[in-house]
Structures are given as structure tokens and as C-alpha cells.
């Protein structure tokens, strides 16, 4: 396939960016931001803290989105000028610079196009992710830890801060489970389709006969709770247990009972936190995780009712979504979107944007049915 002419490529980027601006309705966003700025300037705003939080949060989001789109428009205009300059002066270094900026601009517009699909009620939230080892023994525990690293590397590549809330180590190697937050807007919307079972096929490094092993790990993604969600948990509905934090191989890492396990009695949901320094901090974090799980449970119940009215079924937590084959060949393939790559090393190092973008489109198509 012949490479696209730079001028045609720039026209295509201009058309796509104009389409994004139309979908987002930039003039309406500016009007709403101006109205919220007037509200934020009102000295009496914080007389109602909940409304104040809503106003300031929405204003911050709108301002960031407007800056992002306006910044892309300016970058596109600058690249056009750069190409004109390179051609007028027959300047190859300037042309090379313009081509590199055009490639970066295309990636930024690709990302923004995906962002326009994230219009669900909770899509703009931060993501709370839990990874659990499933069938496969020590290989499954090792696989769960590999997945944890994959998602942390993905977040790092995008500059998203992460916070590990809890890690339960397996006896021999790997982890039984881990929970972490990705502290960036829209990461719930981006990662929601990662929810499900991930299957690994490889030669087991723990088998002295070097046999092929299949192992499974589950990924659970829920939105981080906000105060406006009103997830109230009465004290008589929970049981709180404390224990000592443990590290790899079951080794104790704390001499005090600072780790906290909270059981929600009506639902049986159990959450733990042992990564904070004090029992009080661990309890507060565990309660936040429990609230997020209850919010997701409420959301799933509402989705199930809607699906029942439509005569549909909802995807269960245990649904296998992706295969990672390292032997006898190299292939990562998503079973829903059909996206695949032989670059298994890159995927396991966090290069999963192609899968995440396709997952966003797949989820939006399902929700529009």
C-alpha cells in the first residue's frame, strides 16, 4: 500500500478533528464552562458542599476538554504551516520534523475519537481494578502478577498515576490478588471492557518437565465512588477483621495488626487492604473499595433488569475475553473484537492501546443495541 500523501493526510486529520468538535459541541461546552465559572465565583457556593463539589469537578473537566481540543486544532494548524515552509524552502529536516509531528497528532486524534465514545454514566471516573488468580495453581498466580504489571505499565506509558491498595501474595510465586486505582479521568471507561477472564498458554517455568500449561486470571474493573453516589453502609452491615500484613511467600512485613478485612454481611462481598501504614488508613481505603463494589453491584442489577426487558443476557464476570499464547506460537487475541497481535512481549509490557480502543468501541456498540 502506497504511503498517504501528507497533504491528503492533513486533510483527513482536519476532517476528523472537525467531526470530534461537532460531536463534543465545543460552543456548548464553552457556554456551560462560563456558567459554571460564574457559579464557582459565588462566595456562597460552599454553603452546599455537595453542589460545590459537583460544580468545581464539572468545571475542571470542561476546561481540560476544551484545552485539549483547542490544543489539537493549534497543533494541526502548526503542522500545516510547517509543511508549507518545508516545501517552499525545500527543507528536508523541516519536512522530517513535520512528518513526526503529524504522526503524533494522528495518535492524539485517535485517542480523542475513542474518548468521544465514553459517554456512559460512570465512564469519566477513575478505575478501580482487581486481579485474581484462577485455575492453574502457581502458574495462575504468576499470570495474575504478569497482568498486574501489564496494566501498571500501560498506565505508566500514558502518564496515569496508580496506587496499589492491596496485594495478596501466593506461597510459591506470584499473587493471589491485587487491587489498584488508576488516578486519571476516563480510565474506568477505557478499562471497563478488560473485565473478564484472561487465559495464558505457555511452557511453565515451574514445571521441571517443561510442559505446556494453561492458566487463568480474572480482571474486575469498577468505577471509583464519589460522594454524590450516596453509597451509605450502616455499621451493623459489616464485619471488620484485622491481621498482620504479609509479603511474598507469606512472610510478615508488619509487626502490628494493621491490615483490614471488611465483610459486607448482606451481600457477602469481602475486601481487604494492607498497603497503608496504619489500621485506620487501611480501614478507610477498604471502605472506599467496598463502596465501589456496591455501586458496581447496583449498576449491574440495573443493567440486568434492562437486559431482561430486552430479552438479552449480560456478560458474566467469568467470561473469557482474551487469549495470550506464548507457546507453540506467539499470539494475543481478543475473543470479542477479533483484534490480535504477535507482539506478545509488547502487550505484556503494557502496549495494549489497540485492545483497549477496540474494547471501548465493542462496549459502546453493545450498549446502543
From Swiss-Prot:
PROSITE patterns: RF_PROK_I. InterPro entries: PCRF (IPR005139), Pep_chain_release_fac_I (IPR000352), Pep_chain_release_fac_I_sf (IPR045853), PrfB (IPR004374). Keywords: Cytoplasm, Methylation, Protein biosynthesis. GO terms for cellular component: cytoplasm. GO terms for molecular function: translation release factor activity, codon specific. It is found in: Cytoplasm. The modification N5-methylglutamine is found at residue 251. Methylated by PrmC. Methylation increases the termination efficiency of RF2. Pfam families: PCRF, RF-1. HAMAP family: Rel_fac_2 (MF_00094). Peptide chain release factor 2 directs the termination of translation in response to the peptide chain termination codons UGA and UAA. Belongs to the prokaryotic/mitochondrial release factor family. This is Peptide chain release factor 2. It comes from Acidothermus cellulolyticus (strain ATCC 43068 / DSM 8971 / 11B).
